[in-house]
Every structure is written in C-alpha cells, then in structure tokens.
C-alpha cells in the first residue's frame, strides 16, 4: 500500500505551488495603450460640462467621465491636448484618442447636482480636476472606505488644496457604488483617469496637489513593502544591500528578489511621473505586480516591521495584520533585536570615544542588564490604523488606510 501511495505521488517534488497565480506583470509602458478622450468645446458647451459633473454616480457615469476627462486634458485649445499626449508618449505609452460623449440627458439622476451648483467660470476647471482625482481613489478604496473618506476627510483636504467646493461631493452609497463599478482597474475610463493623473503630475503647477488627492498609493503594487524595507535600512543606518545580506535566508529569497527588481525599476525612472506610473499601475489591471503585497511576502515584511518597530512604533500603525505563524513571529522579533544590537552598538572599549561617551555606555549597559528590553510591537490585528511612510505622506485617524 505504501509503495502504491508513493507511486501515486511521485513527481510532486517538481510541482511548484503558486497560491498567487503568478507574480503578475511588471509595468512596461510600451505594452500599455492609454485612452485620451477628445471633442471640441466651445463657450456654449459649459452646460454640457456642468451636466456631466451632476451626472456622476448616476446611469450616465461613464459618459459623464468621458466629458470631464476630455475637458481637463483638452482645455480650449488643440495645443493643450497635444502637449499632454506628448507627456504620455515620451514616457513610452501608446496613446489612443476616443470620442467623448456629446451630451448628457437632463432630468435623469444627478447625484452630484449639489457639487455642480457651486461651479462658476472661475472655478470650473479646478472643481472638475479635483472631482476626477477623487473618483480615482475608487481604484484603491472599497465603497464603505470611500464614503468614510468623503464624509470625514475630503472637505478639509480639498479646502487646503483650494477646491473647498468638493465638500459637496456626494456620499450617497448608491452613487458611490455606481462610480466604483465604472472606475475599475483595466477599464477604458480608468485608463483615461490614469493618463489624466500622469499629466497632472508632469505639470509643475499641479504636481504638489496630486499626491494628496489622487490614487498614488495602490494596494498590491509593492510600494508598502519597499517603504518598509527602506525605512528599516535607514533606521539601522546601513545600505539596502547590506540589510538584504543580513536577511539571507532561503524562504526570503523570492521576496528579496522582488524588492531588488522593483527598487531598481523605480530608481531608473527618469521623471516623477514615471515613478508614479509604477505606483499607480494597478489602475491598468489587477495583474500588475500581483505578488508584491505584504502578505505575499509576509515573512520579510514582518521582520522589516519588527526592525522599524524598535525605533518608532507609531511609524508602522498603518499596516494591517501581516499573516505569519506564532513561531515565526518570535523568530522575527529575535532577528530584529539582533540586527538592532549589531548596528546600534554602544561600546566602552573603543579607542575612538570620549570619556563622556565611555561613561554613558557603562551606565547604559548597567541599566539594560537590570531590566528586559520591551519587544517591538506585534502586528496581529487586521484593523490597525495610522500612517505609512512609503511616499512621505501622512494621514490622520479619519483617513481610510490601505496596505499592499
């Protein structure tokens, strides 16, 4: 019987289990076709734009988005459109022009009517841009998280960005659900949103606004893992390559390779918009950087979180629970302690320290031997909230957090 079982299972050593279904695609702009909506606007077309703004979240959401995207990319001149298309083609993307909707039916559901009523000739462009950036967040937030963001954060944030009118952005659940259904990764309209955000980042006059309001930190693109890794290396005061050398372990090899690959790609980007193109790539499709999330690389992510937790617990509160076994948690905490001790040596036997430093080291040694060092924070909860440090952004407790 035993021989029969062995025969039945022979060859399984050559079968690789890949629960993620593949690593996913790496962003290669030349393989991506972006959409730019076009259609001339005249003075009499202002009503079409306002109607499109009103219609967001209703039955004509896609048509409305096409009008708004055409307006912000094209403006009132053909030269504006050509300049922005050149930004995208210079990055290597293929650009295809699509005809926008020509009208929006009056009288149908208008969920954003309250926002549209705040429009005038002076603020129209800024309101439309802010609205589109807000819509792009639906590629990273669930409907419930988006409603929380709108009700607790958007008004204050928009006011600091000079678009206080966005406090009237609807939080109606049916409208947000409709928007979320239209703005999904890989959709034609989502690729047009992606193109719009990249052109805004490339423009020095709007560049600073986009990180605050746009979908620049998407789940699963690996940027949280990169942020953890960079933060840990910085805290230890060592080069990234040295940290990877210290973490040499068979089960971490694949994760280390992903870190190196993504860091290299980001570092080789020639412009800020090229870096953000990588960070936002999940807007183009769920397959991008599919295995770069924290829980796809849970072991190295947990070790890195423990290292930085030795320095500042609150710097890691934005991370949701990283799934590792209790046994590995204990091991990771020990690895973090050993690494910190290695690079935070406070010795009194060196010939290149002053008497003051030597005496302080003696007292430090006595104190630490008298009481156990507290462990780094153990991230077991899946509801942790706080802030991340991957892009230099900071969020308060009312801001819906996300992790890769």
Curated annotation (Swiss-Prot):
InterPro entries the record matches: Rhabdo_ncap_2
SS bonds (residue pairs): none
Presence of keyword DNA-binding: no
Biased composition (Acidic residues): 391-404
GO CC annotations on file: helical viral capsid; host cell cytoplasm; ribonucleoprotein complex; viral nucleocapsid
Domain of life: Viruses
Pfam families: Rhabdo_ncap_2 (PF03216)
Keyword set, alphabetical order: Capsid protein, Helical capsid protein, Host cytoplasm, Phosphoprotein, Ribonucleoprotein, RNA-binding, Viral nucleoprotein, Virion
GO molecular function: RNA binding
Subcellular location: Virion; Host cytoplasm
Region described as Disordered: 358-404
Entry function: Encapsidates the genome, protecting it from nucleases. If expressed without protein P it binds non-specifically RNA and therefore can bind it's own mRNA. Interaction with protein P abolishes any non-specific RNA binding, and prevents phosphorylation. The soluble N-P complex encapsidates specifically the genomic RNA, with protein N protecting the genome like a pearl necklace. The encapsidated genomic RNA is termed the nucleocapsid (NC) and serves as template for viral transcription and replication. Protein N binds protein P in the NC through a different interaction, and can be phosphorylated.
Protein family per UniProt: Belongs to the novirhabdovirus nucleocapsid protein family.
Summary of subunit composition and partner proteins: Homomultimerizes to form the nucleocapsid. Binds to viral genomic RNA.
Protein name per its UniProtKB record: Nucleoprotein
Biological source species: Viral hemorrhagic septicemia virus (strain 07-71) (VHSV)
Lineage: Viruses, Riboviria, Orthornavirae, Negarnaviricota, Haploviricotina
């Amino acid at each position: 019987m035993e021989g029969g079982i062995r025969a039945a299972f022979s060859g399984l050593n050559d079968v690789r289990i890949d629960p993620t279904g593949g690593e996913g695609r790496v962003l290669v702009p030349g393989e991506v076709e972006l959409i730019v909506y076009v259609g001339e606007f005249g003075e009499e077309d202002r009503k079409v734009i306002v109607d499109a703004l009103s219609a967001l979240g209703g039955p004509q959401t896609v048509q409305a988005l096409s009008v708004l995207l055409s307006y912000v990319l094209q403006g009132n001149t053909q030269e504006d459109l050509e300049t922005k298309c050149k930004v995208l083609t210079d990055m290597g993307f293929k650009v295809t022009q699509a005809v926008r909707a020509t009208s929006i039916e009056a009288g149908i559901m208008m969920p954003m009517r309250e926002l549209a009523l705040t429009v005038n000739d002076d603020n129209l462009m800024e309101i439309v841009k802010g609205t589109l950036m807000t819509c792009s967040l639906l590629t990273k937030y669930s409907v419930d998280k988006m409603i929380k963001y709108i009700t607790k954060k958007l008004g204050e944030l928009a006011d600091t960005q000079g678009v206080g009118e966005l406090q009237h952005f609807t939080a109606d659940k049916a409208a947000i659900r409709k928007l979320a259904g239209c703005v999904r990764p890989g959709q034609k309209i989502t690729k047009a949103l992606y193109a719009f955000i990249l052109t805004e980042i490339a423009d020095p006059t709007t560049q600073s606004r986009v990180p605050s309001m746009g979908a620049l930190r998407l789940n699963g693109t690996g940027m949280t893992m990169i942020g953890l890794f960079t933060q840990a290396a910085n805290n230890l005061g060592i080069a990234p390559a040295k940290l990877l050398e210290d973490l040499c372990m068979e089960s971490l090899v694949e994760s280390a390779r992903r870190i190196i690959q993504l860091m290299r790609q980001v570092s080789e980007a020639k412009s800020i918009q090229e870096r953000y193109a990588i960070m936002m790539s999940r807007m183009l499709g769920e397959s991008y950087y599919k295995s770069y999330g924290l829980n796809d690389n849970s072991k190295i992510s947990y070790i890195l979180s423990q290292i930085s937790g030795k320095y500042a617990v609150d710097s890691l509160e934005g991370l949701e629970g990283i799934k590792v076994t209790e046994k590995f948690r204990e091991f990771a905490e020990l690895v973090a302690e050993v690494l910190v001790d290695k690079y935070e040596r406070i010795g009194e036997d060196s010939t290149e320290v002053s008497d003051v430093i030597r005496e302080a080291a003696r007292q430090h040694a006595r104190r630490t031997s008298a009481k156990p060092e507290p462990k780094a924070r153990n991230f077991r909860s899946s509801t942790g909230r706080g802030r991340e440090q991957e892009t230099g952004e900071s969020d308060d407790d009312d801001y819906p957090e996300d992790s890769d």
